[in-house]
Amino acid sequence: YTPDNYEYRSYQSLNIVTKHSNNTGTESILIAVLAYREQARKERGVENPEIVAAVTAHPALYKACRYFGVRLVKVPIDPVTFQMSLKHTEKALNSNTIAIYASVPTFTHGVIDDVESLSKLAQSRNIGLHVDNCLGGFLTSYMEKEGLLKKAKLFDFRVKGVTTMSVDVHKYGFASKGVSVVAFRDASLRQHSY
């Protein structure tokens, strides 16, 4: 990328401070969950952390929650759109909730969760919003640019409430097999991943 490149300029202007490069998308999700857990313990005193996710969440989230002692609160998907149910997500949020997990797209159906609406819920509760963009990270960005996503909604750091994103660079990003990245909106959250 060059400074004259639109994508470079727009992402630089978002002040995204940092990322972790990892061996797999699973590791990216593990690191994000660890960061949310530690941040909630240190800053809010949360002892029984929970993450709210749709039943269609990638199995890596189940593993991350099991490893780090985080309760996974599964909510149904909307029967019409197959997106994470906003109504059920809102009902599931409580003082132990450390983050909402959204998929872009879902592993099972290829549906993009309503990240903008989930972001509003996360911001209203002062919790994180992780966007699992491992499966479609590069494709969804270019599909949007080329006008191939009908009724496209924002799903990345352009949405204020998105605090972390996982992206598999090896899927259509021309990187070595397994290379993944977890990006943090700011360095203060990343500090909690160590």
Model-inferred region functions:
Residues 8-13, 20-193:
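Conserved PLP-enzyme active-site core in the AAT-like
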